[in-house]
Swiss-Prot record:
InterPro entries: CheY-like_superfamily (IPR011006), Sig_transdc_resp-reg_receiver (IPR001789). GO terms for cellular component: cell division site; cytoplasm; Mcs4 RR-MAPKKK complex. The gene is mcs4. The keyword Nucleus does not apply. This is Response regulator mcs4.
Amino acid sequence: MRIWFKKVPDGITSSVILSEDHLVDDLKDAIARKFPIRISQYYDAPELSIRVVAPPNASSELQSRELSPNESILFVMETYYPHGQDFNDALLVASPDTSVALRYRSSQLSSSTFESTPPVFSEYPPNIIPTPANETVPRIKQPSIALDSLESPVSAPSRHQSTYSYKGGPLNYNLRNASRTRSHQTLPSSNVNKTGVLLLPRSSRQQTLASRPSLPDLTSADKSQPSDEAESITRKNSIGMSTRSDESTAEKLAKAEVATPTNSRSISHSSLYTKQSGTAGVLPAVNADIDAANRMNPDISSQFPIADNKDPLNADTQAHLGFPSNQIDGIVGTSPVNVLTSPGIGAKAPFASLLEGVIPPINVLIVEDNIINQKILETFMKKRNISSEVAKDGLEALEKWKKKSFHLILMDIQLPTMSGIEVTQEIRRLERLNAIGVGAPKLTQPIPEKDQLNENKFQSPVIIVALTASSLMADRNEALAAGCNDFLTKPVSLVWLEKKITEWGCMQALIDWNGWCRFRGR
């Protein structure tokens, strides 16, 4: 049995299918399931109110009323609609925010009215439509629209058309959209006068600090003009870049030198980013503007003293850190960008980056039967100066691991002769048998000769990472239960793999520090 209902006040008409033994309470549950966002997200099903409307040609005994939860749907349909309920005889469903005592205007009820426009009620609460949970637009107070002031049925259609939009939705829904547009348009204007925060590099921060205009000296009128000129130069270059102007920077510097005597102890900010040999710095335009600001503000050197960098590290400090004296001399006065290219620093390895002294270079075993994947991983390791070997099947991987200890094994699960799960289980069995690892219990029984491992090569359990194209949780649990430390699903991002290798390498270096030092040749 199909039951038609109309959701008020938006006038959405829909239907549900119920059996003859269902009650009104079951109808409320079906309606709540029909509208999981607009009703179920905000109200419970028993909170809904269902109102039956008497047909225009019905007897005077039948009146519009609210249905009780324990009433039979079959009895209501046979009483009010003996010839069957159609689209125009829909029940009225209201939420708790809607007034229960909705007085239906029978004079407005007709087939054309129902097809063209939703019904008009005497009481129309304005804020009925709930806002979805993912809508972040703040709620505003909307103007209420009174519909009880209708005096004649003739004015009802015009008033009703002004209430509903062209899409059939209520007016307050359009008001919300309009307010959202207005609020979005007014957002930029509200932040015009607010001061923003700009994160600048070190040179720009020092420039901004050094270029603050000092307090005007009332005893000397000649110093005010250079201060104003310095302020204008600073305003043009406050973001760390030199801009063009009608007057060149050299002319401004010349005027500044004539107007203000040069301080012999001015701060040499450019020495922090340039070489002492007199070569050009990283930002020559910025350094020139900083020097100009220093000449115009000689008191800054006393407020922010900078230590002389001729002797940054004494002999005791150099000996304690283990740096040769020639390397320290090469670092002094060198730009941070060119530190790796300085003599004795960063030029000894192809993987020349700031992470050279941080990432432990580990030895990786790649177990992969696909030739393309082998070449990709091999090239990836070579570019990052990571020592690696390749095994084509599980048996070859097990033999290579026995002969040479590895820090990390990238294990493919689907392998010929021996699967990755079987190889992992065998490796963990041999590690337990030979008591590899900190705190591993040693067996009292003698170890078979084929299962014995070199104690000098194996100091800690190897990190095994499973690689597979399957994303099933069962495969992941099986790999972790076999002894894998991590589980990666193909295709793997090389950028993310590099981060994980860094993590695993640092972890292995901490676990087996002595073995890693031997691997480094220390």
